[in-house]
From Swiss-Prot:
EC number from the UniProt entry: 2.4.1.250
Name assigned to this protein: D-inositol 3-phosphate glycosyltransferase
GO biological process terms on file: mycothiol biosynthetic process
Subunit field text: Homodimer.
Family: Belongs to the glycosyltransferase group 1 family. MshA subfamily.
Keyword annotations from UniProtKB, A to Z: Glycosyltransferase, Magnesium, Metal-binding, Transferase
Transferase in keyword set: yes
Length: 421
């Protein structure tokens, strides 16, 4: 078995150093940094390449032992819409190669790219360096376009074509769930034998259960409130509008419920999505509070303060928020889509809802309010369920995929045994 010593991560459109829940930063940012750290703890050096978005950024950052982040200078020193990044691909590839040439070691055993822009760059770097490419989609254009919401632009054909090239050219693909692996096969004609399933993890040292009344007191959530929490980017695809409408309906039919809804996150995507106006139109200004995204320890506190975490997403490759909330001992109500069906044990650690009708969501939330004993049982089961999703497990499965990729690459390129690719 070839020893994997050094891996190049490509996360060009968003940095793992960014705060999740704003702009293009979300679960993938958490995934990239946490996986890199877990791999490093297993003895694999990880160097992450991401596009620099500020003239004040250092060239290299060291967030964790064995992990470094290269801020690649390409294009203007500011954040750009994802749609503009393909124009910078050749520039980014050239700059990454210049960085590699300046490194004392000068080589990587493998490339692991994240999201389609990085995957297209990874194809070129794989050819240039003579090493295998492993790719994780995180989201897919064809799947997103099937679930397109009113007012949202479809993913461009250029992205679909890029993803098809990646599926055809990558040595191996890593999916978050069996459902995602099936989507790769059905929508992109991927070879099932070249796909590995590695569920994301959760930081079990940060996201832990705690005494709920204490968490509420620390955040100013009154003891008698039925507290519903949404955490994520503010966009139609994540469904905060579904929660607002369901909460308004619940309030109208059950005025005896002392309701509080907290939304954590920042606007992402369509600029015409006005959450504040939606809240006002629903008559929920006195019930719904909106806060900017917070760091992981603070987020854990918010999860512990909630009676229920609500995820009315239209699409999720996995749904890290669901796992993090459960690790804190809080049940999750989510849409029965994508990876959420795997992240949540329906009926045991939370509930899955079919569709996005406000009445259906209000029914489920009302039933949980009326049954605090079941909420408590679900919370305890949720914390136990999440224990099976540590990042070291994800890293171990990913490392197996890397070894398979190297063996496959050596075999397909007829590299003599004993020589690294």
């Amino acid at each position: 078995m070839t020893l994997i010593r050094r891996v190049a991560f490509l996360s060009l459109h968003t940095s793992p150093m960014e705060q999740p829940g704003s702009g293009d930063a979300g679960g993938m940012n958490v995934y990239v940094r946490a996986l890199a750290s877990a791999l490093a703890a297993s003895g694999v050096e990880v160097e992450i390449f991401t596009r620099s978005t500020s003239s004040g950024q250092p060239a290299v950052e060291h967030p964790d032992p064995g992990v470094c982040v290269h801020n690649v200078i390409s294009g203007p020193p500011r954040k750009l819409p994802k749609e503009e990044l393909p124009e910078l691909l050749h520039s980014m590839v050239a700059e990454i190669e210049r960085i590699r040439q300046r490194q004392p070691h000068g080589r990587y055993d493998l490339i692991h790219s994240h999201y389609w822009v990085s995957g297209v760059a990874g194809l070129e770097l794989s050819r240039l360096w003579g090493v295998p490419l492993v790719h994780t989609m995180h989201t897919m254009a064809k799947v997103k376009n099937l679930l397109l919401q009113s007012g949202e632009k479809p993913e461009p054909r250029r992205r679909e074509d890029g993803e098809l090239r990646i599926v055809d050219g990558a040595t191996r693909l890593i999916a978050n769930t069996p459902a995602e692996a099936a989507e790769l096969v059905s929508h992109y004609n991927a070879d099932f034998d070249h796909i590995d399933v590695a569920p994301p993890g959760v930081d079990l040292t940060v996201f832990t259960p705690a005494f709920r009344p204490r968490s509420r007191a620390q955040l100013g959530v009154p003891a008698g409130k039925f507290h519903l929490l949404f955490a994520g980017r503010i966009q139609r695809l994540k469904g905060p509008q579904v929660l607002v409408k369901a909460a308004a309906l619940l309030r109208s039919r059950r005025p005896d419920i002392d309701l509080q809804v907290t939304i954590l996150g920042a606007l992402s995507g369509a600029k015409d999505f006005d959450l504040k106006s939606l809240i006002s139109a629903a008559g929920m200004d006195d019930v719904v509070t909106h806060h900017p995204p917070v760091n992981a320890p603070e987020l854990a506190g918010w999860f512990r303060s909630a009676d229920v975490v609500v995820m009315p997403s239209y699409s999720e490759s996995f749904g890290l928020v669901a796992l993090e909330a459960q690790a804190c001992g809080t049940p999750v109500v989510a849409t029965r889509v994508g990876g959420l069906s795997r992240a949540i044990f329906d009926g045991r650690t939370g509930l899955l809802v079919d569709g996005h009708k406000a009445a259906d969501w209000a029914d489920v939330l009302e039933a949980l309010y009326d049954d605090p004993a079941t909420r408590g049982d679900m919370g305890r089961a949720a914390a136990l369920h999440a224990q099976g999703f540590g990042w070291q497990r994800t890293a171990a499965i990913t490392l197996e995929s890397y070894h398979a990729a190297v063996d496959q690459y050596i075999d397909s390129h007829r590299i003599p045994v004993g020589h690294s690719p």
